[in-house]
C-alpha cells in the first residue's frame, strides 16, 4: 500500500518549468529520498507535498485522501504532515520544551510527559528542556526540530536537507539516528538532498530529478548499478564510461573483453563500470591482459582513489579512476594489471 501518490504533478514559475508531470508512489513506512542538483525541482516538489505551494496540474493523495487536485486543496495545517527544514527553524523566543510542545493538545502533566517522551526518543537530556535555541549545537537543534514534528503524530514526515549544516562526523550519526527513530515510529518519510552519499545511505526508494523531471526511481542499489543514462551515473558517484561493441554478452572495449549485464543487445554502445569494480594486481612475469601505470594516489584512510593510465594498444594514455584498500594501494609510478569485478552496465540506446 502506498502512503503517498504523486500523479502528473506540474508547476511553472512564469516561463520556467519547475516540475514536469511528476509521477511517484511512496510505500507506507518507507524512506524515499528525492535527490538532484540545485534547480532540479526537488525542493519545489517537497513544498507541494507540504502544502506551501500549489501545482498547476496533477494531484496528490495521502493514504487515499486527495490533498490537492484541480478542484480543491487541503491547507498545510490540516494535512498531518511533519516538516523538518534545513536549519531547524526553532522559535527563538521559546525554550526547548515549548518548541517541542508547540501545538500539542495535551495540557498540564500530560503535556509535560509527552514532551519528555519525545525528548527521550531523540536522545535529548531532560536538563535541556529549559534551554534556548541559541544555547544548542546544530545537531541538538535538529533533534528538537524532529521532536517537534513528531509531536503532531504525522502521517508523513518531510525532511528538507536536515543534515547539510552539520559537521561530517555528526551528519552520519544523526542520519542513522533519524532513520532508526522514524522506522521504529512507522512514519513514512521523504528526504530531499543533493548529497549522493546521503541519498544512497538513507533511502529505501531513491528518486533522481533533473530539470524538473523524474528521470529514474527505484531501490538505491539498482540506481547505482544500473542508471538509465550517463548523466545519472555520474551524479550518483564516480563512473568509468567508455564506448564498446557488444557481442554475445561481452563488451569489446579499451579494457579488453568485459562481461556485460545485457545479453539481448548487440552492436555499438556505451558501458559503465564503477571504480570499485576495477581490481589492481602486480603484472605477472609473463604479462597478458590489460596493463596500466598508477599516475596519482589520493589517500583517504581506509580507501584510496587511484588514477591509472592505460598501456594498451587500443587506447594508450587513457586515464581511469580505481578504488583500492588504503592498506594495499600501490604508489604512483607502479605498473599494474587491471581486472574487472562483476559485469559492466550497458546504457539503453536512445
UniProtKB/Swiss-Prot annotation:
Main location class: membrane
GO cellular component, one term: ATP-binding cassette (ABC) transporter complex
Entry membrane topology: Peripheral membrane protein
Entry-linked SMART domains: AAA (SM00382)
GO MF, any single term: ATP hydrolysis activity
Intracellular or extracellular location(s): Cell inner membrane
Its EC number(s): 7.2.2.7
Keyword field: ATP-binding, Cell inner membrane, Cell membrane, Ion transport, Iron, Iron transport, Membrane, Nucleotide-binding, Translocase, Transport
Catalytic activities: Fe(3+)(out) + ATP + H2O = Fe(3+)(in) + ADP + phosphate + H(+)
InterPro entries attached to this UniProt entry: AAA+_ATPase, ABC_SmlMolc_Importer, ABC_transporter-like_ATP-bd, ABC_transporter-like_CS, ABC_transpr_FbpC, Mo/tungstate-bd_C_term_dom, P-loop_NTPase, Transp-assoc_OB_typ2
Domain (ABC transporter) ranges: 4-236
Enzyme class name: translocase
Family that this chain belongs to: Belongs to the ABC transporter superfamily. Fe(3+) ion importer (TC 3.A.1.10) family.
Function description: Part of the ABC transporter complex FbpABC involved in Fe(3+) ions import. Responsible for energy coupling to the transport system.
Subunit structure: The complex is composed of two ATP-binding proteins (FbpC), two transmembrane proteins (FbpB) and a solute-binding protein (FbpA).
Protein's UniProt name: Fe(3+) ions import ATP-binding protein FbpC
